[in-house]
Amino acid sequence: MRFYIAFFFLLLAADMALSFEIGNSEELERLSMVYGEVESERGCTHGSCENGETCCDGWRCRYTGRAVPFMCVP
């Protein structure tokens, strides 16, 4: 019985972690849309910087280890 309870909480934790990750992806997408107009005018980015793009507003290019490996972060 203890095994089933532990397994349930393990599944719950995994579900919460995936929900958090999806939420962050949606937030990054929203921010990239907001900053998109500013970026095109200034020639810098708040998004992906894996091809040598310059980050805006003092943000730095960092390795994220996700689908887009290098992103500009505050």
UniProtKB/Swiss-Prot annotation:
The residues that cross the membrane are none
Task: Give the record's keywords alphabetically.
Answer: Disulfide bond, Knottin, Secreted, Signal, Toxin
Subcellular localization is given as: Secreted
Instruction: State which residues form the propeptide.
Output: 20-30
GO cellular component, as recorded: extracellular region
Give me the disulphide-bonded residues: 44-56, 49-61, 55-72
Which top-rank group of organisms is this from? Answer: Eukaryota
Signal peptide positions (record): 1-19
Name where it mostly resides.
secreted
Tissue distribution? Expressed by the venom gland.
Q: What is known of its domains?
A: The presence of a 'disulfide through disulfide knot' structurally defines this protein as a knottin.
Descriptive protein name: U6-agatoxin-Ao1a
- According to its UniProt entry, this protein's organism is Agelena orientalis
